[in-house]
Each structure stands twice: as structure tokens, then as C-alpha cells.
Amino acid sequence: MGLKKVCLTVLCLIVFCFGIFYTFDRVNQGERNAVSLLKDKLFNEEGKPVNLIFCYTILQMKVAERIMAQHPGERFYVVLMSENRNEKYDYYFNQIKDKAERAYFFYLPYGLNKSFNFIPTMAELKVKSMLLPKVKRIYLASLEKVSIAAFLSTYPDAEIKTFDDGTNNLIRESSYLGGEFAVNGAIKRNFARMMVGDWSIAKTRNASDEHYTIFKGLKNIMDDGRRKMTYLPLFDASELKAGDETGGTVRILLGSPDKEMKEISEKAAKNFNIQYVAPHPRQTYGLSGVTALNSPYVIEDYILREIKKNPHTRYEIYTFFSGAALTMKDFPNVHVYALKPASLPEDYWLKPVYALFRQADIPILTFDDKN
């Protein structure tokens, strides 16, 4: 056993004995245990290389699952990092966990950038990156996350593949077109630099040799001629046929994680006679006057199941800015509408999103949000 392996063993034993990396994390139920990684590093380092897939959202887990299906027989380690944990996150994490060789859920309820969370978590990620066997490919969607760079910088020779993260990949104002990671505070910035070296958003973007997109026919910010673009259909409605829509109409509002949207969402629901709201996976508040669809499924999977059960029902989906409008617009018996409050100024921050909806032929309905 070489000196490097001895040092890694000692460091891991210190971590396990004193619980340094678990001080602020008591709800992960062993999903961050590194014993298996240490065992591989010490005794099976020459085995078949692994592919890493990093996810931050349920949509990203759905894409990751499809990517894994295209590479049967290969080893995949999945890393989910999230500030949220609920029924939906657990359902889709367990789905992908069953298909991966290993899966890790980093639940960060206070966010990575909190001072007490940043340094121990980044240190944990760096240690675990060094415990991995040989890495062949790294897949990611959230280019702006410094946490992923802890792994990218450890394996600079690994192939980098990127994939879509909703509408972030379709608007020119996307954070994925940035240069450096946004880390607040000099101490945290200096520590991040120790963990990731000169890695940056731009370096990650430029290193990507292939990008998977779930949006067909829409201009992607990663489609700049530097890499292969691969279309990856995410939700399969090909076996469903449009019915005659004589079974009534179900109107559903897509929720938002932003609490500031509560009042305006309630007004929209009343204005358009919307009966249901599909809460966003990160939404923590309810809406009065509408019924919440409490389901472990994301809205696309939920609607596909409903169409199978009720092929003659008309489904109307209303949204302010959800990318699910784009993934559902071609479902049979589904009609998608974007909502625009009349009070929004001409230079409002959602303007690029509404331009995208127009490009996708999604009707935009303006309503009076002041009465």
C-alpha cells in the first residue's frame, strides 16, 4: 500500500471517528457513507472505470436516468445535492438509486454557501472525489455549482458531458454563460480555490464535448459549434392517442418555489377558474381556493398517467415560467398556457422566458393581477 493510500486511510478514519462532515447533517440516513468508496480505493482501484452523474433537481435526475439507460453495462455513481428533501425527491432518488451502482444524497437544508456549511461540505466532497476509482466520464447540468468542480478538478482528464437544466439552457441570460463561480466571502473563496484550483464555469463549459438536450427545435446556449448536440426525449407520450375531449376539462396551475408568487398565483387561479395546483418540488407554501395535487410524481409523469386513465379528458396547464410547459406542450389532450400579469413592466425579468414561450407557440394570456 503506497503512501498516498495510507494518507487517505488516515484522513478518512479521522472523518469517520469525529463526524466532522456530519455536524450539520443528521438526516441523510447513511447515504453519504464513504466506507464503500474507501474499500474500492484501497483494494479495487484497477477495476472498470466509473461514470459520475451530478444532479441538483428532479428534472436532472430524470435526464440522468435516461443517460444511464443508453450505456448498459457501464458503472455509474450518482450524486444528488439538494437544499430540499420531500416525497418527490425521495421517490426519484430511489428510482435512480436502483439503476446506479452507487448513489449519494447530499441534503443541504441551509444551502452550500452558508458559512458553517461551506467549508466542511467542500472538504467532504474533495476527500470523496479522491476516494473514487478511475473516472471515465462526468455528466452534469449545473455548470455554476462550485461543489461539482471539486470532482472536476480531481479528474481533469475525464470526459465531460453536459445536459439540460430546464429553461436555463434556452435563454441568453443564463448563469451557465458566466465565467467564475459565485462564492460569497473572502474566506470561502480562498478555500474554494484550494479545493478546485483554477476551475471555473467557463472551463467546465469549454471542456464539454457533448450536450444532451431535452428540447427539440429550440436554440440551446450550449449549441455553439464546439460540441456534439444530442437530443434526449425525456417523457414518452408516443403510445398515447388524442381523445375527443368530451370527458370534461381539468385545469392545473404549475406552482412556483418562490413565496412571492403566492398572491398572484391565487389571483390567476380565480381569474381562469383553475381547480388544481401542482406544487413545485421545492414549494413549501399552499394556495387558497385550489386543490393541491399531492403526488410523488413530477407534473409530466402525473399527466401522462392521468391521460392513460382518462383519455377523453381535456387538460389545461397554466404556468408563469415553468419549463414543464415546453416538455408537455405536445402531449395529447394537453393545452399549455403561459400567464402574464398585466402589471409587469416592459423590461421585466421574465421577458426572455415569455419570448421563449412565443417561439414554442405557447399562447400567453395576460390577466389583471391588481383586482
Swiss-Prot record:
Record: residues binding CMP-N-acetyl-beta-neuraminate: G255, A278, P279, H280, P281, R282, I299, E300, S322, G323
Active site residues of this protein: D258 (proton acceptor), H280 (proton donor)
Localisation: Cell outer membrane
Keyword Cell division found: no
A Gene Ontology biological process term: lipopolysaccharide biosynthetic process
Signal peptide coordinates: none
Acetylation listed as a keyword: no
Membrane topology: Peripheral membrane protein
Keywords recorded for this protein, A-Z: Cell outer membrane, Glycosyltransferase, Lipopolysaccharide biosynthesis, Membrane, Transferase, Virulence
Observed effect of gene inactivation: Cells lacking this gene do not express sialyltransferase activity onto LOS.
Pathway connected to this protein: Bacterial outer membrane biogenesis; lipooligosaccharide biosynthesis
Gene Ontology terms: cellular component: cell outer membrane
GO molecular function: N-acetyllactosaminide alpha-2,3-sialyltransferase activity
Complex formation: Homodimer.
Name of the molecule in the record: N-acetyllactosaminide alpha-2,3-sialyltransferase
Organism per entry: Neisseria gonorrhoeae
